[in-house]
Amino acid sequence: MKLHIGGEEAKAGWKIINISQKPNVDFVGDISDLSQFDQDSCEEIYASHVLEHVPQQRVLETLKGIHRILKPGGKFHVSVPDMDILCHLFINPMADPDVKFHTMRMMFGGQVDPHDFHYFGWNQFFMSDFLRQAGFSNAERVESFGIFQDTSDYKPYGFPISLNVIATK
């Protein structure tokens, strides 16, 4: 199975798990509790702008849960807001107040519902370290996954604001 965590876009061959029941959602659940899936049941897992919504104290166990359901050799495609890029945008003295406000919302979440808050500020160092601790190998940063049309490719103000990584079980 190919599992899209937090997704909404239907795509042939992929199943969607989302925290809310919506059209195209196959499973309702939380990224931090994937116990409804068997060990080694997924060949690929995709999570775009979901992991930052996990409280800091649950990040490692969440990544271990993702690792558990991936088949050996399986790929985890993960995208999060890149705090290094967002900080650069935010402190830019040439940025107007609207740019700064939009950037701040990308840092902390839009906060339009109880699930739209960011608990963790990711960068390449943190991502590589947590993936390694969870048992992943070969964490490689990529510009784009080319799988779904989503925030992983978002480039406001000409900057790609996502940290996109593919890790292997």
Describe every region a protein language model picked out.
Residues 2-88, 125, 165-169:
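Conserved SAM-binding loop
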